[in-house]
């Protein structure tokens, strides 16, 4: 791939340090620090980034919302699908109450984007208050507007089978979490015959929390970016959006995020596709993030 150039942000040398750090070394600013000055430098994606981004033109963003979540974190490791995670086995006992998908044809901006979002009725479990505050689905709403788990996952997997035939690629923020819970829920719903196909699609998917991608974003933007340093994947998604927001198109999902910070499955699935599209453009077109609004927070 030919070299591309973009403006990245490099911090000015600090000559008045009082914290004991070496003032001769430039500091890399945090995401919220907008005091850096632009400097032209080459940012060519390394081969491992190019390989991870892939060449598929059809992406399907996937997201789930759960009835609760655990705050426990483990050492960073690779999960069952080969992606990095800090989740332990207890995470995969979480119950899905909303699942959404958004299909994006990267080669045709005028193509209709197939999308849907399904609410699942709780069966023997309650939705935690903290979860409702995150995604807006209460126990009452889920019982009224939801459908049985088996019905929802059967609809979902039929769509996935059709998209797989079109060589669509899964794009998920924290793939091990979402894909692992979906895999477990397929068994819970008595739909084990879908698991092999789902696992195959997940292994070939793209995780927007990949540390290699995070390091490359840091090079492009001149800002520290550790996707796994946040307490939850939701915070990591918000940080990713903050970094890429000047480049993300104005759409309902982005407006919803900026307006009320609700993380519904359908909106987050669309955001996953937009992040993937932006990263692909950064790699192929040398998209200049730093020149656009100085990475202003949304």
Language-model features: where?
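A generic local structural motif
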Residues: 45-48, 154-158
């Amino acid at each position: 791939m030919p070299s591309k150039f973009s403006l990245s942000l490099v911090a000015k040398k600090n000559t008045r340090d009082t914290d004991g750090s070496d003032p001769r070394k430039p500091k890399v600013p945090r995401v919220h620090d907008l005091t850096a000055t632009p400097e032209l430098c080459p940012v060519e994606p390394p081969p491992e980034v190019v390989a991870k981004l892939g060449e598929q033109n059809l992406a399907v963003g996937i997201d789930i919302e759960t009835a609760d979540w655990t705050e426990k974190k483990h050492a960073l490791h690779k999960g069952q699908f080969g992606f990095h995670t800090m989740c332990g086995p207890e995470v995969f006992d979480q119950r899905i109450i909303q699942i959404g998908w958004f299909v994006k044809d990267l080669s045709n901006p005028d193509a209709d984007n197939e999308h849907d979002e399904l609410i699942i009725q709780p069966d023997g479990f309650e939705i935690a208050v903290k979860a409702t505050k995150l995604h807006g689905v209460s126990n009452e709403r889920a019982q009224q507007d939801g459908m049985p788990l088996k019905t929802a996952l059967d609809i979902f997997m039929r769509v996935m089978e059709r998209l797989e035939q079109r060589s669509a690629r899964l794009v998920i923020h924290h793939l091990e979490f979402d894909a692992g819970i979906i895999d477990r829920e397929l068994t819970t719903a008595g739909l084990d015959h879908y698991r092999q196909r789902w696992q195959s699609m997940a292994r070939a998917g793209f995780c927007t929390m990949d540390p290699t991608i995070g390091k490359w974003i840091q090079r492009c933007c001149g800002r520290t970016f550790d996707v796994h340093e946040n307490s939850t994947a939701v915070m990591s998604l918000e940080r990713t959006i903050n970094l890429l927001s000047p480049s993300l198109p104005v759409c309902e999902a982005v407006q919803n995020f900026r307006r009320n910070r609700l993380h519904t499955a359908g909106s987050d699935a669309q955001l996953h596709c937009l992040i993937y599209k932006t990263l692909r453009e950064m790699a192929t077109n040398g998209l200049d993030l730093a020149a656009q609004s100085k990475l202003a927070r949304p």
